[in-house]
Amino acid sequence: DKNTYKVSGGLHGVGVSCVNALSTVLHVTVHREGKIFEQEYHRGVPQYAVREIGATTDTGTTTHFKPDGEIFTETSYNREILAGRLRELAYLNRKIRITLTDEREKDEQGNVLSEPFYSEGGIMEFVQMLDRNGRRNSLLPAPIFIEAHDAPSNVAVEVSLQYNDSFSENIFSYVNNINTIEGGTHVAGFRRAITRVFKTYGDRNKLFEKSKIEVTGDDFREGLSAIVSVKVPEPQFEGQTKTKLGNSDVMGVVDSAVADVLNAYLEEHPKEARTVINKVVLAAQAREAARKARQLVQRKSVLTGSGLPGKLADCSENDPEKCELYLVEGDSAGGTAKQGRNRAFQAILPLRGKILNVEKAMEHKIYENEEIKNIFTALGVTIGTEEDDKALNLSKLRYHKLIIMTDADVDGSHIATLILTFVFRYMKALVEQGYVYIAQPPLYLVKKGKEQIYAWTEEQRKAAVATLAGGKEDSVTIQRY
């Protein structure tokens, strides 16, 4: 309904209908045309017709609803999830103030918890936050900001981008404030403009001549953080989940908007332009080195056949669906894990120390790393398929459960984070297919005589001592892992 909303994330107008059907109570108050209206529903059934209850100078709608406990097993809301989404909306809609109030908890002064979300700079601040949280150092003095409106299609475009010293691409895209995690035509238009504009600038100024390697679109996106946000009156999504935009005209609109601003920026900032081009050249050289390193990983697995890592304690089962691979830290942990495992379906691979931080390493260094090569070999995965020479090939995957099992202390948490980062960046298909798990080992074992209780937190440890010895720590044995 274009008379109600300029743009909307909804497609079918069933949002409030579904909430109503799934709530025990839903109450709506509308301030409109100088009047206040209300209506209440119980489990989707109206309790009375829409009625006028007063006068107002405001406009807007307030909706109260209570999830139906007979439908949902969990009806309490997670404040952190809501806060994350509202923070995102504040960045995407600059200068709009959003307040999250949680009346379930109070602060030390007895006040209800209330958190405001407001962004003066919008998606420029969003990009800066992404790099700050990722501990990436920016290469440009400030993010580049692009804002445009295409009159024929009535599509509005906002883009902010920043280059940093990392080796990965971080692009987040939105359509009418919906996160399109699979991208779509708006992201394709953005990438096309980035590649074309930088390539043209580099060729014109003879900045690629020394590299002796043909640069590709991927090279221009290494170390790029960006937010691409479009407002589309009639969005067409591929699939019901709204994760990929399909409007073909949006690609050209975004491409044109980004190219116009970027061309002007490069001409006005030659120093920054050269900084980015130098990074692109390095990315191309690293890509070529990584290609050779990937071929070595591929060739090694082909030539050596079943040459599994020497430290791998494999299982006897051959069916991948029944097999589990535990990644543990060090030989000592590997030893105890081997003693406690079920040999039939549980395999153990000890890793030596902290594995490489792939977020800060060049790609070819990753494929040359011994521990990472061992993970590839043990899993039986390789790089390259018939369709894509960089895609993960799972055709010979040996385990359908990859379990990261590190100590419960800070060090163990750090190692688990490093492994997860590697898996997410270079074996994402395993995550997407639900093959990756994190073990939850206890931090303490509290023992008295033949009774023992495992504890995962300090609070649980104290509770275990209270249970076994009435709180007397000197009468129990506490083992910290």
Swiss-Prot record:
Requisite cofactors: Mg(2+); Mn(2+); Ca(2+)
GO CC, any one term: cytoplasm
Protein residues bound to Mg(2+) 1: 329, 407
Domain of life where this protein originates: Bacteria
Keyword DNA-binding set for record: yes
Catalyzed reaction equations: ATP-dependent breakage, passage and rejoining of double-stranded DNA
Subunit structure: Heterotetramer, composed of two GyrA and two GyrB chains. In the heterotetramer, GyrA contains the active site tyrosine that forms a transient covalent intermediate with DNA, while GyrB binds cofactors and catalyzes ATP hydrolysis.
The protein's name in its UniProt record: DNA gyrase subunit B
Organism: Chitinophaga japonensis
Source lineage: Bacteria, Pseudomonadati, Bacteroidota, Chitinophagia, Chitinophagales
